[in-house]
């Protein structure tokens, strides 16, 4: 048979406009679709006619992973779909661990819940941050607590995946208590539920006032660092910001502290003509120059990613 191809595809947080063009193309090209049933339901309108669809329930991760690999070994073009990004608390790592000899494998990134809720809240991930799952289904709870303590001692903005479920109720309060030992009571804490969905809910609070009961299985929680704050946008929205500490900010995010620049004040850019035609050969970019040009840049919605690991 023809050599099979397996794409492990991230669907993003659930809204169609955050499904990447590459992910959409891999889904439309696939002759075999596998995934957790709610994720498969998201893409039914774009699957090619005649494609085989394997939609399974939670708890069958091993079976659907094996089925996706086997279909690719039979020469099929397979899209194995996951919420958010496939490499973040999802199916990319078990797929690669299970073994993919004899097939071509591609991991197609997706907008993960952490990034989706960051955009919803403002810019809480503007500086160094940690991502921790509070589910002890696959990780020992003592190890999770060790990681929470490290994030607390390092003053990292901390995003909690899988913060609470029907049977896991003590984990989030325990984690918040550890963070509260190292951060002021006024530290911003926000919860986003059903991110990028019609029923999206946002609660912005502080470490001192936050109530774990606000959190459900479709939620994610972001706890700020000691420098995080709430600011008000021009359209009078409350936003969560962690300063990047750019030297030109002077330590304040206040419009009256900064000059109103016009284009005449900006340094003159190099006058370079860019061609729409890509170069014939790839160009090596110096890592230091790239880091400078990127200005030192550092994800299953809260409803999609939390289904990954409950």
Question: What does each model-found stretch correspond to?
Answer:
Residues 84-157:
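Class I SAM-dependent methyltransferase SAM-binding "motif I" and its flanking Rossmann-like core
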Residues 1-16, 21-111, 211, 252-260:
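Class I S-adenosyl-L-methionine
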Residues 69, 119-121, 145-149, 178-180, ...:
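A generic local secondary-structure boundary/capping motif
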Residues 11-18, 138-141, 203-205:
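Short gly/ser/thr-rich secondary-structure transition/capping motifs
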